[in-house]
C-alpha cells in the first residue's frame, strides 16, 4: 500500500472554504490597512484566497496578542495547549478581538 500524503493544508476542506457569496472576493482595504499596536488582542481568521502570510489551520479562530511587527506581518503570541507560540501572520488573516463580535 502507498502512504497518503499529509500536506500543510490536509483536513482543511471545510475550514478553509469561502461561502459562495464571498468567493472570488479580495480582502477589503479596511481589513488590510488596520494598524495594530503591541499588546492588542487579535483573532486569527484565515482568508483562504490569500496564501502569503497564512498561518497553519490549527491557529484558525485562536485569540492572540500582538508582540511586534516584521515587515508587513505581525508577530502574534498564541497559547496552544500549555505552550506559548509566536507566529508570523499578515493582516489579511487578522481581525481585532473587540470588533470580532
Swiss-Prot record:
<dbReference type="GO" id="GO:1990904">
    <property type="term" value="C:ribonucleoprotein complex"/>
</dbReference>
<dbReference type="InterPro" id="IPR008991">
    <property type="entry name" value="Translation_prot_SH3-like_sf"/>
</dbReference>
<dbReference type="InterPro" id="IPR036948">
    <property type="entry name" value="Ribosomal_eL21_sf"/>
</dbReference>
<dbReference type="GO" id="GO:0005840">
    <property type="term" value="C:ribosome"/>
</dbReference>
<dbReference type="Pfam" id="PF01157">
    <property type="entry name" value="Ribosomal_L21e"/>
</dbReference>
<keyword id="KW-0687">Ribonucleoprotein</keyword>
<protein>
    <recommendedName>
        <fullName>Large ribosomal subunit protein eL21</fullName>
    </recommendedName>
</protein>
<feature type="region of interest" description="Disordered">
    <location>
        <begin position="1"/>
        <end position="23"/>
    </location>
</feature>
<dbReference type="GO" id="GO:0006412">
    <property type="term" value="P:translation"/>
</dbReference>
<dbReference type="GO" id="GO:0003735">
    <property type="term" value="F:structural constituent of ribosome"/>
</dbReference>
<keyword id="KW-0689">Ribosomal protein</keyword>
<feature type="compositionally biased region" description="Basic residues">
    <location>
        <begin position="1"/>
        <end position="18"/>
    </location>
</feature>
<dbReference type="InterPro" id="IPR018259">
    <property type="entry name" value="Ribosomal_eL21_CS"/>
</dbReference>
<comment type="similarity">
    <text>Belongs to the eukaryotic ribosomal protein eL21 family.</text>
</comment>
<dbReference type="InterPro" id="IPR001147">
    <property type="entry name" value="Ribosomal_eL21"/>
</dbReference>
<dbReference type="InterPro" id="IPR022856">
    <property type="entry name" value="Ribosomal_eL21_arc"/>
</dbReference>
Amino acid at each position: 500500500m502507498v502512504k497518503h500524503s499529509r500536506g500543510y493544508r490536509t483536513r482543511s476542506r471545510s475550514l478553509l472554504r469561502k461561502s459562495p457569496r464571498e468567493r472570488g472576493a479580495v480582502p477589503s482595504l479596511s481589513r488590510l490597512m488596520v494598524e495594530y499596536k503591541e499588546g492588542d488582542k487579535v483573532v486569527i481568521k484565515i482568508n483562504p484566497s490569500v496564501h502569503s502570510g497564512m498561518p497553519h489551520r490549527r491557529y484558525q479562530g485562536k485569540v492572540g496578542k500582538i508582540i511586534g511587527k516584521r515587515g508587513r506581518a505581525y508577530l502574534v503570541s498564541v497559547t496552544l495547549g500549555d505552550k506559548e507560540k509566536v507566529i508570523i501572520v499578515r493582516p489579511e488573516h487578522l481581525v481585532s478581538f473587540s470588533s470580532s463580535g
